[in-house]
């Protein structure tokens, strides 16, 4: 369960106060958590955009340096695959050519031709976005990733598809027409392309400053409307059964001897007996809630720590050279 200021937020009674990261997306978290979280899509409005998240000016500057590299940079459209060579170039470092670096001129030309720009995993290379995703992740008890989409008017970057995540779409510029279809009807669903057998359940026109919430697995696609559409997709990852299996193995066998190589059958049988004894003693005490918490904690730990090499602190500690 998720706690905020000592109160259960998700998985129990609704909190009486809005948590930090979620407050930057939603004016009032209580109705959202009660009526929409993991249930159905909704358009939300917030007075402020996420603090410190990537802006269009910063994206322009990052692409202008040419330092961004594939796969952080991608161009997509529904009618054909855009090869990396169409929007990337080589950089020469120490007289060696290294391919795959963003080419600002090619990206601009493809945008004019109706192609969508995607900046992937922004939290891995933009400090402000990294800090916001950490705040939101703490509030929701999940791992959060960020993707930055730039779509020209009338263009569609991705086909109808399902994401293995809950998604908050934050419209930063222009507007975009969204079509959200129903979620999966069984736990055996797979992320990726989806069929449009049924009409969308909601089809909002998302404007600057609005936030669209799409529950995990709900199929969706979007087209650029007026102006240059820019949005930040905050993908809230959750675990699957395989994660529960790994967590169970870790909890049940965490104290078991590792890296042993018994040299005879008697020693091997003794180790097998010890493992079974540990399993039978630990299993009755393990609860489903503990297993779920451990699996989600392990997933959240996968997020990059965003550590700095501390060059400024190192310079200060060494002091200035004598004059």
Where are these regions (language model features)?
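Active-site region of the double-stranded beta-helix
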Residues: 2-35, 48-53, 57-210, 218-259
